[in-house]
């Protein structure tokens, strides 16, 4: 790929209408990834590690289960402790969805616009490190949104009715939904729910650490009792390799028992 084919001087991105020749191996891999988002995450998703820099994402068992749940079900609700890789796992699926499906719209919404922007930033880093034959050409690439040559678009914003009014999404990803004030959560769902139910394959993924009695609690409570369509996934802190009784004792010693109960 020569310099004329890169997007706005970024050598990690190809611009729209760039010709790439696929090998037979590329085609096989592309089809395999399209069928299996866990295979895609294990082989093509790069993340930035605090200790090692840019590394290949290797999901834990519970993260693979989450990705499969996102893929196989329309409505997912996930109750997860801090630092269990919930953002990375979610981004892996959203990246798979936008690259390997044409003309899809994804909304990444969080309790704060900066948090949503950070999630999109992680997705963009992973995208830049995909092989060029797997990338779509770039139409637009911004801090709060992107558009790919295959027609797929992603918007990152704070969770509010005004952020999504008049728009339709194939996936709505709601991060830290338990931290969205009740009145905002209520008006948000009143505004967006008709557009979700108008499609037969639209998805809602709700992920949060618990935070009191609120909309997230109600959705979770109803999901556990099969009173709504959400598939509940509860991740325990001990499911992360290396987190055992000693880790718990050390974490409590460095913080407090109360803080551990809140965050884990």
Protein language model regions, located:
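Phosphate/NTP-binding elements of NTP-utilizing enzymes
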Residues: 2-264
């Amino acid at each position: 790929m020569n310099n004329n084919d890169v997007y706005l001087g970024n050598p990690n991105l190809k611009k729209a209408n760039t010709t790439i020749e696929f090998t037979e191996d590329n085609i096989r891999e592309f089809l395999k990834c399209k069928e299996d988002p866990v295979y895609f995450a294990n082989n093509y998703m790069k993340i930035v590690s605090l200790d090692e820099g840019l590394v290949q994402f290797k999901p834990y068992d519970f993260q693979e289960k989450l990705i499969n749940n996102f893929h196989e079900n329309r409505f997912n609700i996930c109750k997860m402790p801090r630092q269990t890789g919930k953002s990375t796992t979610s981004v892996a699926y959203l990246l798979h969805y936008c690259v390997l499906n044409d003309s899809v719209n994804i909304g990444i919404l969080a309790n704060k616009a900066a948090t949503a922007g950070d999630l999109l930033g992680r997705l963009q880093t992973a995208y830049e490190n995909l092989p060029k034959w797997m990338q779509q050409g770039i139409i637009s690439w911004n801090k709060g949104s992107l558009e790919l040559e295959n027609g797929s678009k992603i918007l990152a914003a704070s969770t509010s009715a005004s952020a999504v009014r008049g728009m339709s999404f194939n996936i709505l990803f709601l991060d830290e939904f338990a931290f969205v004030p009740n009145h905002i959560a209520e008006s948000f769902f009143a505004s967006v729910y008709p557009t979700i139910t108008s499609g037969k394959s639209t998805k809602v993924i709700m992920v949060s650490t618990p935070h009191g009695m609120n909309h997230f609690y109600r959705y979770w409570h109803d999901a556990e009792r099969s009173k709504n369509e959400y598939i509940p996934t509860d991740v325990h802190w001990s499911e992360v390799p290396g987190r055992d009784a000693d880790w718990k004792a050390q974490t409590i010693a460095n913080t407090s028992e109360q803080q551990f109960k809140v965050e884990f």
